[in-house]
Amino acid sequence: MMEENRAEQLLFLWEKISEGEIRLLRVFGEQPVVTVPGFIDGRCVRELGDYCFSRRKLPENEIRYSRYCGGMWESGLSVLKDKEKKDHISSEQEENIVSLETIERDGKLHELSEKYIKEVQLPADIVKIGSCAFYNCTKMERISVYPKLVEVGGDAFMNCLNLRSLRMCAGVEEPTGLKQLLAQIKWQVEVSFEQEDGEREAVLLYPEYYESYDEIGPAHIFELNLTGEGFRARQCFKEGVILLNAYDEIFPQACVEESAEVLIPMAWNRLYAACGLSLEARAAYETYVREQSGKVLAILLKKRELKPLHFFFEKGYGRKEQIEDAVAIASHEEWMEGVASLIAWKRQLFAEPEKTADVKSRYSFEEF
């Protein structure tokens, strides 16, 4: 996993959970994209501590550091102030010591928190994300997790409103901690179940939902109101496994409450990665995609991905005149690969039936 970080320097602050397990407390790096290693200093990374990716006070327990640079590791004791470092050195403690002040003065290293974190991939053995672990990470867009993650602390993603993509490195039929993650993300987010080779088994869009309270009578009793189908979608689990049929059943009501910007990716994602899709649900999604075919095509052209575009026309969601329009748009945008592919698909999928010999003879006679 550290191969993805090999070209850069990373520094981790952590504390022991047990002799072989640690809790991550801080991450420093050169880039706002990080792959957290599964092992640090020979110990398994089991948890993200509270406020791990947020600028908040560190715990008062003994804190260790591990620095990774160019494929090599260095570990030792971490202290907050330079003065504390001098005190430890004067006491002839025989190990590396680094102060937080020294780390923060490093011109290359940035604390990966708040506005300087964009994407995080967690290791396979993490079981817990602490409370407020990503508090105020306003630029974070994507997080990747594994099925062993089952505990997510309160407000773990508070104010992470740009977090729109959640990658589950698991099969869609595996029990995961996805429900716990979604409970902390009330805004719209796309979840993809991906295998090790990157193949997407299923992609699900969870719409945003809102909570409000109405006061009932003088007794100061409050009634909770939920707006949006996103809440219902987030309940479609049994023993950690997502219930795809239950998820699909919310679509008819979502068509009443949600906008096309929400419904198009909901329908398209289920058709394109159609794991566990019933005939009834497929028919409902296909009807909607055909009704919105112009908007769907515009989205696909903007992404410049050939496989989904071919799927769109191959399945009959797009018409002949739309593929002609798509050729013109791709040409205008100077996407030559797209132009060539669209022209080939037009010939393949919308070929004119050849005239019979009798028709050809009749046309020749009339022309004569």
Where are these regions (language model features)?
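Repeat-mediated protein-protein interaction surfaces in helical alpha-solenoids
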Residues: 268-285, 307-309
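Ankyrin-repeat helical register
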Residues: 299-300, 326, 330
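Ankyrin repeat structural motif
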Residues: 305-313, 335-344, 351
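Extracellular beta-strand-rich solenoid/capping regions of secreted or surface-exposed proteins
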Residues: 48-50
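Ankyrin repeat arrays, specifically the small/polar loop and inter-repeat linker segments at the C-terminal end
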Residues: 284-292, 317-324, 337, 347-360
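Structural signature of tandem-repeat unit edges
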Residues: 2, 7-21, 28-46, 58-128, ...
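Extended, charge-rich intrinsically disordered regulatory tails
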Residues: 320, 363-368
